[in-house]
Amino acid sequence: MYNLKVKKLNDDAIIPNFAHKGDAGMDLYSIEEVVIPPGETKLIKTGICIELPTMTEAQVRPRSGLALKHSVTVLNTPGTIDEGYRGELKIILINHGKNDFKVEKHMKIAQMIVKPIYDINIEEVKELSDSERGKGGFGSTGF
């Protein structure tokens, strides 16, 4: 088991938590009230900083309920939090709906998943090996 260290920047901040045992994503909470007009984005503060375990990253993903019920989602999904980042976690939300959306203080606004990463050596080559797929992409397998 890995430990995720969390520092509150504000006494009102909520520590990320899992809604159910076995969930992959832990909920992230807003520390402020913000209105997001239709078609606009806002950067929402969480009031926390984290220290990830060695050789991991955190991915910030949307909450399905916000997307389905309010057409509000995380804009850069998944958002990547690198292991060495120690600043406040902030979530970019976009309102695809037709009405203003009010982010309430302590509202669940996104979920965060901690994933392992690999130590990668980048090697420039003249040629790549062949594969069954080759260069096929962008609908090449049909619709």
Swiss-Prot record:
EC number: 3.6.1.23
CC cofactor: Mg(2+)
Residues the entry annotates as binding substrate: 63-65, 76, 80-82, 90
The reaction(s) this protein catalyses: dUTP + H2O = dUMP + diphosphate + H(+)
A GO term for molecular function: magnesium ion binding
GO biological process: dUMP biosynthetic process; dUTP catabolic process
Entries under NCBIfam families matching the protein: dut, PRK00601.1
Similarity comment: family membership: Belongs to the dUTPase family.
UniProt protein name: Deoxyuridine 5'-triphosphate nucleotidohydrolase
Organism field: Clostridioides difficile (strain 630)
